[in-house]
């Protein structure tokens, strides 16, 4: 997280929620232990800012087997050698993530691997994922996220809002996956959403949002 982003979020009086495909401990690390509610694995593992667990709903073994079989089929169509040292498959509990280049590939490699998402879309066109209970979404810069079709970011954001007794009209969501088949798409229609390109764009929009709020515009 950018130091200026950390300071901006830290000083906000509103509740901050990080919704991510990553595991909760990694969210904490990536955000420099910023005090936030954390919805990891597309919201299927939720914790309070102090670490108190709100819920955790992992995939079952049958679903894991179904996902891994599809990933193995996808691997046959990847147009390069897969570097297994870069962890192409991560089982995060409630979510399994496949990155053809590797989940822990260097950032500079990830940035140029599939910026327009076409490589991943072509893979899914070649090997469609057909499941009664599961879906796959394009997530992050290089990954495909497999989750339960009824337990995605949209349902989990709504679940948290209901649990906390908040008003949906008071909530706003910033995401880079607010497009068809994106891993933020399910939040559209749940609360107000704003599409961002990357972390720098997120910072600029948040800074503008906070400035306008102070002026009474928002």
Give the predicted meaning of each segment:
Residues 1-88:
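Active-site phosphate-binding/coordination module
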Residues 8-13, 27-32, 126-131, 183-189:
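Alpha-helix C-terminal capping segments
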Residues 15-17, 37, 97, 172, ...:
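A structural signal for isolated positions on well-ordered beta-strands in alpha/beta enzyme cores
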Residues 23, 43, 102-105, 178:
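Short, glycine/serine-rich, charged loops/turns that create anion-binding
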Residues 27-29, 50, 108, 183-184, ...:
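Short glycine-/acidic-enriched loop or helix-start segments at secondary-structure transitions
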Residues 39-42, 140, 197:
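Residues at the C-termini of beta-strands that transition into short coil/loop
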Residues 82-172, 180-183:
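Conserved acidic, metal-coordinating active-site core of Asp-based
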Residues 149, 153-218:
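Mg2+-dependent phosphoryl-transfer enzymes with acidic/Ser/Thr/Gly-rich catalytic loops
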């Amino acid at each position: 997280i950018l130091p200026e982003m950390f300071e901006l979020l830290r000083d906000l009086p509103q509740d901050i929620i990080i919704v991510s495909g990553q595991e909760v401990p990694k969210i904490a690390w990536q955000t420099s232990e910023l005090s936030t509610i954390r919805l990891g694995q597309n919201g299927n593992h939720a914790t309070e800012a102090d670490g108190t667990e709100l819920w955790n709903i992992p995939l079952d073994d049958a679903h894991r087997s179904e996902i891994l079989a599809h990933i193995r089929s996808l691997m046959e169509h990847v147009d390069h050698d897969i570097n297994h040292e870069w962890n192409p498959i991560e089982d995060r509990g409630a979510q399994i993530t496949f990155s053809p280049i590797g989940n822990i590939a260097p950032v500079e490699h990830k940035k140029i691997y599939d910026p327009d998402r076409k490589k991943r879309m072509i893979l899914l066109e070649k090997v469609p994922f057909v499941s009664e209970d599961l879906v796959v979404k394009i997530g992050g810069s290089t990954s495909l996220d497999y989750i339960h079709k009824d337990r995605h970011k949209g349902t989990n954001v709504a679940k948290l809002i209901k649990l906390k007794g908040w008003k949906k009209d008071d909530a706003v969501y910033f995401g880079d996956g607010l497009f068809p088949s994106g891993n933020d798409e399910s939040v559209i229609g749940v609360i107000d959403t704003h599409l961002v390109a990357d972390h720098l764009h997120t910072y600029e929009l948040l800074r503008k949002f906070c400035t306008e709020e102070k002026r009474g515009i928002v």
